[in-house]
Amino acid sequence: MVTIALGSRNPVKINATKEALDVLKLNWDLIGIEVDSGVDKQPFCDQTYVGARNRALNVIRVTNADIGLGIEGGVCNVYGKFIANAVVYVITKEGLENFAISSSFTLPSSMVSLILQGKELGEASDIIFKTNNSKTKEGAIGLLTNNVINRKMLYVQPIVLALYPIYNTMINNTPF
């Protein structure tokens, strides 16, 4: 049995990983362990990649799982607009590494202002929408889209994409 370890105990990230494994019809054991990302609570731009990779590396070290998976949400200024997205990074114990990026979405100036004052996106969302701990539920994307797209949905596709070299190799003996 293949064991995949997620570098988080956030229920949204765990459920998104479960859904991705279900979509792929992979009967892997999933464990979620909180590990350090090595980046700020609210990473910007390239630090999002660093945080996701660090989570994957750290969780595979702590658990000795077959696959380490890190998910890190971040914010970046692109052409004068702040966008949010997530990076999903996978590492196997054999050293294969891959990553994928979620869809991105622009943030309203009210959120950007709070983020630039030191709040993380989840905190900014909670303040503006008068919610609590939205990062473990629908997330900023869910609040902004009236749950047409929620945080779990945002993560499933990049998890599938980050894992493709691993499950294709296991299923089809495709060399990567």
Swiss-Prot record:
GO MF annotation terms: ITPase activity; metal ion binding; nucleotide binding; ribonucleoside triphosphate phosphatase activity
Domain of life where this protein originates: Archaea
Binding residues for Mg(2+): D36
Disulfide bonds, paired cysteine numbers: none
Keyword Zinc-finger applies: no
Pfam annotation, one family: NTPase_I-T
Catalyzed chemical reaction(s): XTP + H2O = XDP + phosphate + H(+); ITP + H2O = IDP + phosphate + H(+)
First-tier enzyme category under EC: hydrolase
UniProt EC number: 3.6.1.73
Family: Belongs to the YjjX NTPase family.
Name of the protein in question: Probable inosine/xanthosine triphosphatase
